[in-house]
């Protein structure tokens, strides 16, 4: 898919289709008024006849509008003027792309980016249009023998900006939107891959493939033998029941002018399949536990976006690849593990395994002397109960970092909600036999999981994103969402100091 930006009048556009907005009730947007004027009232006559009310998402495709150079004009309902919000805007873009694909238009000039969206600027509107378009066109059919094909798929979109001075802003928005979309695409592809293909070695191979095409990226892998030497006993215990080797993949991106600048570290939980281990999960929907590597998929996707944007910062991404399976060699409830940090953990439930993998990785990253560390994981079902499918859970021991991530979520539309990390919750992890348990009980499950992780992050500023509710969808639209790539990518853009404002 090719994207570009222009600034110009609709009557001068020669394209397969022009896309313009209509407000409710039957009010033409400024661009639609220009088309109506040159067509001598053709469009307003149709609206007076009741062909389109202007409700959000309504579509009316016109052919051969008088005096208009383009073959088609697509009128898009945008709701009431000045009330268009970001959610409606993205829904309208999605519906527009679907309609354009059905018409067989291979290219279109879209003026929806000139609409007023509450609290949003040109950069946001263009970038979200790119990302929403790419997301709506995504399909995972790599393993299908019969692939569905659009008659004449949309290949080129031109987004219009109001003035020529905004062209540079629009071009930057397209650049960033394409990069984030590429990251989301990779995230979704890796996460949607079945667990008999996507194991820890596969995760590592995807990272190595990326390094082959990006000079600033170096990838190394750490297998079980080296983990044992490092004392990563907690991580190793989780993978003991699987015939697939646990592999930690380290992706080092050096983009800063000073290569010695402290790196930002992103850690992704990479349980390529989580059966629960000896504490076996119920059979219903267990197939979706291939998505328990959603954190690692988000990190590799964010690293892809980072490489595409060529941001001037140093970032390390870690994919904590592992598989939690039951066997005679599996770790058990009642086991006491000595973590890489030296702290001991009593295992109460082998299905609370993500934190046992992450705690050793969070200790391992101390060697990088990081500027900050963000881990992302499909960690707890409790977070899904608390926040549903719309917001990721955010926990942090550092207020400025938490505020940065919340802001990045609002900017990108990949929002998070901060949860408490109060000292009172730590008592729920007490064990009579070890320094802590790996389970705090049913109440406040996502909070006690984050409290557990916080005990391994004392040497740097840290935040934890629980994406259990946001990394994938179930039901009819089953599949990876591509989150948390947008929030992580936006955070890195903000940290890099790249100018994006008008």
From Swiss-Prot:
GO biological process: proteolysis
EC number: 3.4.11.1, 3.4.11.10
Subcellular location: Cytoplasm
Keyword set, alphabetical order: Aminopeptidase, Cytoplasm, Hydrolase, Manganese, Metal-binding, Protease
Entry binding sites for Mn(2+) 2: 269, 274, 292, 353
Entry note: cofactor: Binds 2 manganese ions per subunit.
GO cellular component, one term: cytoplasm
Residues holding Mn(2+) 1: 274, 351, 353
Cofactors (names): Mn(2+)
Catalytic activities: Release of an N-terminal amino acid, Xaa-|-Yaa-, in which Xaa is preferably Leu, but may be other amino acids including Pro although not Arg or Lys, and Yaa may be Pro. Amino acid amides and methyl esters are also readily hydrolyzed, but rates on arylamides are exceedingly low; Release of an N-terminal amino acid, preferentially leucine, but not glutamic or aspartic acids
InterPro entries named among the record's database cross-references: Leucine_aapep/pepB, Macro_dom-like, Peptidase_M17_C, Peptidase_M17_leu_NH2_pept, Peptidase_M17_N
Catalytic residues identified in the record: 281, 355
EC class of the enzyme, as a word: hydrolase
Molecular function as annotated in GO: manganese ion binding; metalloaminopeptidase activity
Entry's transmembrane regions: none
Functional note: Presumably involved in the processing and regular turnover of intracellular proteins. Catalyzes the removal of unsubstituted N-terminal amino acids from various peptides.
The family this protein is said to belong to: Belongs to the peptidase M17 family.
Protein name: Probable cytosol aminopeptidase
Organism ancestry: Bacteria, Pseudomonadati, Pseudomonadota, Gammaproteobacteria, Alteromonadales
